[in-house]
Amino acid sequence: ALGKSGKEPVLVLRDIKTENYLGGSLAIARHLSDFCKEVSVLSFLGEKDTHKSFIERNIEENICLNFLTKSNSPTILKRRFVDNVDKKKILGVYSINDDLITNEEEDLFIESFDRLSKEHDLVIISDYGHGLITPRVAKHISKSEIFISLNAQINAANIGTHSIRKYED
């Protein structure tokens, strides 16, 4: 951080270094790929700014990507500004549309989930509260016959609005 601007009451930052990495469900898949023979990912990319080529270049060979398209959305991109001295996050800027997916997108997700879950021993659901897992999708997942491991996260974009309660026993 450089400090406060002399002209306006705003924080001024300087980008010294840039790092790009795969986060969210792709980070989980990459960790799992170290000790699992095969890992599948089912998620959404935005119809705008997909970043698909970056993802494909940086994903392990034993990870099978199954992407659906979320309409009127970018692929989620989180920029974080980190202080160069103490490595603490100063600011985050998210490119995101966390509106719920459409009914048609729900249908595609459920169809893909049913197909893929039959091919695997374990399903890990990472619900970041960004509109991809609707109450209808959560109810469908909850009724699955396969063992489900669930991670419902609270983050800066969903505090107070996201809960694990939408999943049934």
Q: In which residue ranges do the predicted regions lie?
A:
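Ribokinase/PfkB-type carbohydrate-kinase core domain
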Residues: 1-2, 7, 15-169
